[in-house]
C-alpha cells in the first residue's frame, strides 16, 4: 500500500479557475463543506429489463448512504447491461460479451471524467461483473465491486426450478415429453423476483470469483438479492471503499497472481461456468497479471469439484448461502492448503483474517461434499488442445459420464441452423454438432449456445451428442459441450475447414480435441475456402476489428502488451 491523499483526484476542483466547475457541482447539492471531502462514485448497471438488475438503483442508494456515513460525498451514475437470458437465442446475444467491454469502458470514462477519488460498482447480470472489474483494474483507484445477489429458486409442484428448467423444457416439449401448458407453467414460476440466475451459472461464478480475488466484501457474493444480509453488504461497501481511501489501498495491491490462483481454485471447487476462463483472463490482463489457459489446467488437476450445485447438481446458490456461503467454502479450502491466506483484500485484512470471522460449513449439510468424497476428484473445467483447437478450447465436464466421445461432425455456420436440425431430429446419438463463425470476431461477440445445448439435453441426448463451438456456453449449460475453440473460424482456425462427416474426438482424460483430417487435406481445404468478411457497422463492427482471441480473454486492448504508463 502507498500513501494516497483522500482527495487525490477531486482536489483538481479546488483552484480559483475551477469556479465554473464548482458552480455545476453546487447545482447537484454540494456545499463548501462537501468540497473538503472525497468524492466517491457509485455506478450500477440498473435496468428494468431483467430481474438480475431491476433492483440495483435502490442498491445504489444504499451504497450512497454507506459512503455518506463514512464522511465522503457520494455521486450515483448508471451504465448499461445486456440480459443474457433475454438475448439468448436471438441476434441480441451478439451484444452480450460485447457489453462487458462497453461496461468497462463506460465506467472508466464516467469515473475518470468526473475525477472521483474512489467508487463502488454494482452489478447483477453475467457481464456486469467482469466489465466492472476490468474498469477497476485499469483505473487502479480505491474501488469495490458489490453484487446484486442471486435470485431465489422458483417452485413448481413442490420442486425448485430456475430459468434453465424452462430452456430444457423446450427440448422436452419438442421430444414429446412435456406439453405446451407444462412449459408455460415452468415459464410462469421459474423467476420469482430480483437477482442473478440461481445456479452456479456465470453471474454467481463471477461474483464468487471477485469475492475470492478480494475485491468484494467477505460473504457478499452468496447473499441472496432479497435478503437483509444483501442490503447490509451493499451499504457496507460504501463505507469500505472510503476506508480503502484512508488506507491508501488500491486494486493493484489486491489483484496479485496469488489472488487469481485462488479465484480459479474456488471456481473449480464450486463447479463454476466456462465463462470464468474468459473473464479471469481479461481481468488479469487489465491488472497486468500474467495468466494463461494453461494455468487453469494446472489448478484443475489438483482441486476437486465439491459443490452439488446446478446445472449439474441439485442445489441452487441460495442453498449454499444457507449452509455458510462462499466464506465457509473458502475457510474449508484454506484449512486444507488450497488457498493463499496471507494476501490482502479490500477490507485491509488478509484472506485468513477475514475468514476467521465466519462460521464453518453447517454440520450435516449436503451442498458441499467433503474432500475425501468429492463430486469429482479433479476440477470440472478443462482446457483441451489438438489439431481442432491449437490455441485451446474449454470444456465443462461436471456431471458428464462420457469421458471420450468419437463421432461424425455435423457442421453449422449459425446456431439457428443447428437448432433447426435438432428440432427436426436430424441430430442422432453419436453425432458431434459443430457451430462455427460465432467466435469473438465471427459472431461478432461470441454468443452463447444455451438454447441449443438445453434442447439437446431436454431431448435426452446430453450424454450422447457432443456440441462444439468457437462461441460460448451459458453457465447454465451442461452435457458434452466444448466452447471457446481457438483460433476461431473467422481467424482461419482449423474449425473453419471442418466438414460434415469428419470424425472428431473429444477426450477429457487426455485433454484432446482433434479431427481426423490430414495436414495435406487441411491445406487443400484452406485453398478452396473463402472466409467471410468481418462485420463492419456500428459497435459490433468496432468490436470485431479489435477483439482478441478467446484464448487471451477476448479483450479489446491487446495492442499494448506491457501497458506501461497507461494508468
From Swiss-Prot:
Binds 1 [2Fe-2S] cluster per subunit. This cluster acts as a Lewis acid cofactor. It holds the Pfam family ILVD_EDD_N. It comes from the Bacteria. InterPro entries: DHAD_IlvD/Edd (IPR050165), Dihydro-acid_dehy_C (IPR042096), DihydroxyA_deHydtase (IPR004404), DiOHA_6PGluconate_deHydtase_CS (IPR020558), ILV_EDD_C (IPR056740), ILV_EDD_N (IPR000581), IlvD/EDD_N (IPR037237). Functions in the biosynthesis of branched-chain amino acids. Catalyzes the dehydration of (2R,3R)-2,3-dihydroxy-3-methylpentanoate (2,3-dihydroxy-3-methylvalerate) into 2-oxo-3-methylpentanoate (2-oxo-3-methylvalerate) and of (2R)-2,3-dihydroxy-3-methylbutanoate (2,3-dihydroxyisovalerate) into 2-oxo-3-methylbutanoate (2-oxoisovalerate), the penultimate precursor to L-isoleucine and L-valine, respectively. The keyword Transferase does not apply. PROSITE patterns: ILVD_EDD_1 (PS00886), ILVD_EDD_2 (PS00887). The active site is at residue 474. The lineage of its organism: Bacteria, Bacillati, Bacillota, Bacilli, Lactobacillales. Belongs to the IlvD/Edd family. Homodimer. Keywords: 2Fe-2S, Amino-acid biosynthesis, Branched-chain amino acid biosynthesis, Iron, Iron-sulfur, Lyase, Magnesium, Metal-binding. Its EC number is 4.2.1.9. It is an enzyme of class 4 (lyase). Mg(2+) binds at residues 84, 126-127, 448. PANTHER family: DIHYDROXY-ACID DEHYDRATASE DAD, DIHYDROXY-ACID DEHYDRATASE, MITOCHONDRIAL. This is Dihydroxy-acid dehydratase. The modification N6-carboxylysine is found at residue 127. The gene is ilvD.
Amino acid at each position: 500500500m502507498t500513501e494516497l491523499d483522500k482527495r487525490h483526484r477531486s482536489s483538481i476542483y479546488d483552484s480559483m479557475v475551477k469556479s465554473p466547475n464548482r458552480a455545476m457541482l453546487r447545482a447537484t447539492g454540494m456545499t463548501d463543506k462537501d468540497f473538503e471531502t472525497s468524492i466517491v462514485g457509485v455506478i450500477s448497471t440498473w435496468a428494468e429489463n431483467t430481474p438480475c438488475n431491476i433492483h440495483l438503483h435502490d442498491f445504489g442508494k444504499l451504497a450512497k448512504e454507506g459512503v455518506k456515513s463514512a464522511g465522503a460525498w457520494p455521486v450515483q451514475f448508471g451504465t448499461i447491461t445486456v440480459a443474457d437470458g433475454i438475448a439468448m437465442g436471438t441476434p441480441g446475444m451478439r451484444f452480450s460479451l460485447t457489453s462487458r467491454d462497453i461496461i468497462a469502458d463506460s465506467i472508466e470514462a464516467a469515473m475518470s471524467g468526473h475525477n472521483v477519488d474512489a467508487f463502488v460498482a454494482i452489478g447483477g447480470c453475467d457481464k456486469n461483473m467482469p466489465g466492472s472489474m476490468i474498469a477497476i483494474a485499469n483505473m487502479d483507484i480505491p474501488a469495490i465491486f458489490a453484487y446484486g445477489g442471486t435470485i431465489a429458486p422458483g417452485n413448481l409442484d413442490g420442486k425448485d426450478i430456475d430459468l434453465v428448467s424452462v430452456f430444457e423444457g423446450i427440448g422436452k416439449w419438442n421430444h414429446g415429453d412435456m406439453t405446451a401448458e407444462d412449459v408455460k407453467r415452468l415459464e410462469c414460476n421459474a423467476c420469482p423476483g430480483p437477482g442473478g440466475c440461481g445456479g452456479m451459472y456465470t453471474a454467481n461464478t463471477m461474483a464468487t470469483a471477485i469475492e475470492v480475488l478480494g475485491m468484494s466484501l467477505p460473504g457478499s457474493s452468496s447473499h441472496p438479492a432479497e435478503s437483509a444480509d444483501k442490503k447490509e453488504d451493499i451499504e457496507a461497501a460504501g463505507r469500505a471503499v472510503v476506508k480503502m481511501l484512508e488506507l491508501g489501498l488500491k486494486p493493484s495491491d489486491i489483484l496479485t497472481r496469488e489472488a487469481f490462483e485462488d479465484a480459479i481454485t474456488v471456481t473449480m471447487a464450486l463447479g463454476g461456468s466456462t465463462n470464468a476462463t474468459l473473464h479471469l483472463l481479461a481481468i488479469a490482463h487489465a491488472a497486468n497479471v500474467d495468466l494463461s489457459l494453461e494455468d487453469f489446467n494446472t489448478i484443475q488437476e489438483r482441486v476437486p469439484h465439491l459443490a452439488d450445485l446446478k446445472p449439474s447438481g441439485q442445489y441452487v446458490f441460495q442453498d449454499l448461502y444457507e449452509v455458510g456461503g462462499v466464506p465457509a467454502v473458502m475457510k474449508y479450502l484454506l484449512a486444507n492448503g488450497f488457498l493463499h491466506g496471507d494476501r490482502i483484500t479490500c477490507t485491509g485484512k488478509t484472506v485468513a483474517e477475514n475468514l476467521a470471522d465466519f462460521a464453518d460449513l453447517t454440520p450435516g449439510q449436503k451442498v458441499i461434499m467433503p474432500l475425501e468424497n468429492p463430486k469429482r476428484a479433479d476440477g470440472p473445467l478443462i482446457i483441451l488442445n489438438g489439431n481442432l483447437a491449437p490455441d485451446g478450447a474449454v470444456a465443462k465436464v461436471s456431471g458428464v459420464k462420457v469421458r471420450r466421445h468419437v463421432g461424425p461432425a455435423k457442421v453449422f455456420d449459425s446456431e439457428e441452423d443447428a437448432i433447426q436440425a435438432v428440432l427436426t431430429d436430424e441430430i442422432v446419438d453419436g453425432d458431434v454438432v459443430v457451430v462455427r463463425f460465432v467466435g469473438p470476431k465471427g459472431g461478432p461477440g461470441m454468443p452463447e449456445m444455451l438454447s441449443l445445448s438445453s434442447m439437446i439435453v431436454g431431448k435426452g441426448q446430453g450424454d450422447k451428442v457432443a456440441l462444439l463451438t468457437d462461441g460460448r456456453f451459458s453457465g447454465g449449460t451442461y452435457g458434452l459441450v466444448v466452447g471457446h475453440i481457438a483460433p476461431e473460424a473467422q481467424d482461419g482456425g482449423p474449425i473453419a475447414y471442418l466438414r460434415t462427416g469428419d470424425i472428431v474426438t473429444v477426450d477429457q482424460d487426455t485433454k484432446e480435441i482433434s479431427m481426423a483430417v490430414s495436414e495435406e487435406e487441411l491445406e487443400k481445404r484452406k485453398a478452396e475456402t473463402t472466409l467471410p468478411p468481418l462485420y463492419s457497422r456500428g459497435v459490433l463492427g468496432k468490436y470485431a476489428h479489435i477483439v482478441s482471441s478467446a484464448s487471451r480473454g477476448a479483450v479489446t486492448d491487446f495492442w499494448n502488451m506491457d501497458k506501461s504508463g497507461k494508468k
